[in-house]
């Protein structure tokens, strides 16, 4: 979802968050952009600016990283514009006190700075299907050409930036995981993506979440797990502590090598809104947090339908 609705309502009552939570409960992996409010007009870093539905704990909320025009990942950084956590939405309790969600977000980051994308055929604003961005900001196409785009007629490319550019990469990764293992539940997809993410140096949890998207590692971990998890859970035959590993499988080595560089996975996932969880048991044993119908944030637990 490329949505960034500004609002102050808690995920408990926010309409977009409730709709996303219902979709997750139905077995749909929901990916949302974090928003682009990580920097104030004066250039100061801003925390607590995650937008809805990215405020929803069950959603995979994605921030943007800057790959700096290189294939290697050691120089990647979180973009200045990418919204930082935690969520600051809330509600007024019956006793008059204000509840603030304070959910750890974003969940991870993906490339979202000057990424090449397709341009609509007609770039004239007055023409049908005109590409307003390309017309107003021709430098976006010039930047693509500088990256090597041939700019053939009807095949033009432009540079795009934003968490709305990063989120589709994670949505695609989630689809690849479900292709590799159709038995994954949405919370398990999220945990795998976080656990296998690459931590970026000099970035904290509220800037990068668990780290940068690592599809290679995520697929390896997904393939090591049973392919009947979602079905067994729906049938009521899977309970906390049951074996998650597929027959004859063991957990993969918790590192990846991409473009000649080896890095360790983050080996963390978010749970309960503000908790970090780790350890092999996250994926060797079934955890109740992998039930898509449950939402747990601090002292609140919801059964979603």
Q: What kind of region is each of these model predictions?
A:
Residues 3-7, 11, 15-33, 43, ...:
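Topogenic and prosegment regions of secretory-pathway hydrolases and membrane enzymes
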Residues 36:
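Conserved A3 ("GATE") glycine/threonine-rich loop of ANL adenylate-forming enzymes
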Residues 166:
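C-terminal substrate/ligand-recognition segments
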